[in-house]
């Protein structure tokens, strides 16, 4: 089990709890590395990180919306590259019903609040389908908006998908 974060403070916190978390979940192979989610071939220290097809389950909790739209293509390609045949995705993130305008995208408070980078709902699912994932579904989609800005509804949703094994 490998956790990734680019923030050294978060990594320090994660590593301080690593032993107790590993014993609670019953796995001894828990580690954390400093990396960018859209550059998984090596970590931020220049060390090799993830080979092609080496991850059985990709879990992400409110991270994809923090990636700039200009880097989303690379992000998606990296998720696809590291997912093993037969692998699965479980991604919880923020989606919206209308495109986020530039003025909201440029607001640092809304970026840190997971609003500015929200994925358009239809694009969120289709992006993974276009990569070859199957059974792509939004599950546990929040019916009522979490927040509304400029008439745009923002809500949480969980996406699940599978990569065919053959």
Language-model regions: role of each:
Residues 1-47:
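Class I SAM-dependent methyltransferase SAM/SAH-binding core
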Residues 38-39, 64, 94-99, 142-145:
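Short "lid" loop at the C-terminus of a central beta-strand within the Rossmann-like core
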Residues 58-59:
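Hydrophobic beta-strand segment of the Class I
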Residues 62, 78-80, 128:
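Class I S-adenosylmethionine-dependent transferase superfamily signal
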Residues 72-88:
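A short glycine-rich, Lys/Arg-flanked "PGG" loop and its adjoining helix->strand segment in the class I
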Residues 95-115:
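Short, glycine-/aromatic-enriched active-site segment of Class I SAM-dependent methyltransferases
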Residues 116-132:
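Short alpha-helix
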Residues 131-166:
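C-terminal lobe and adjacent flexible extensions of AdoMet/dcAdoMet transferase-like proteins
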């Amino acid at each position: 089990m490998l956790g990734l974060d680019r923030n050294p403070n978060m990594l320090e916190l994660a590593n301080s709890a690593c032993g107790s978390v590993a014993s609670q979940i019953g796995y001894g192979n828990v580690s954390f590395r400093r990396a960018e989610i859209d550059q998984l071939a090596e970590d931020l220290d220049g060390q090799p990180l993830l080979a092609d097809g080496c991850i059985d389950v990709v879990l992400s909790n409110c991270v994809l919306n923090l990636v700039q739209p200009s880097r989303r293509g690379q992000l998606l390609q990296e998720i696809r590259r590291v997912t093993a045949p037969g692998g699965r995705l479980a991604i919880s993130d923020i989606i919206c019903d209308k495109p986020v305008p530039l003025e909201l995208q440029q607001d640092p408070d809304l970026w840190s609040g997971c609003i500015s980078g929200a994925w358009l709902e239809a694009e969120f699912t289709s992006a993974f389908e276009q990569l070859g994932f199957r059974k792509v579904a939004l599950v546990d989609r929040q019916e009522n908006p979490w927040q509304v800005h400029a008439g745009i509804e923002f809500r949480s949703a969980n996406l699940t998908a599978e990569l065919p094994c053959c």
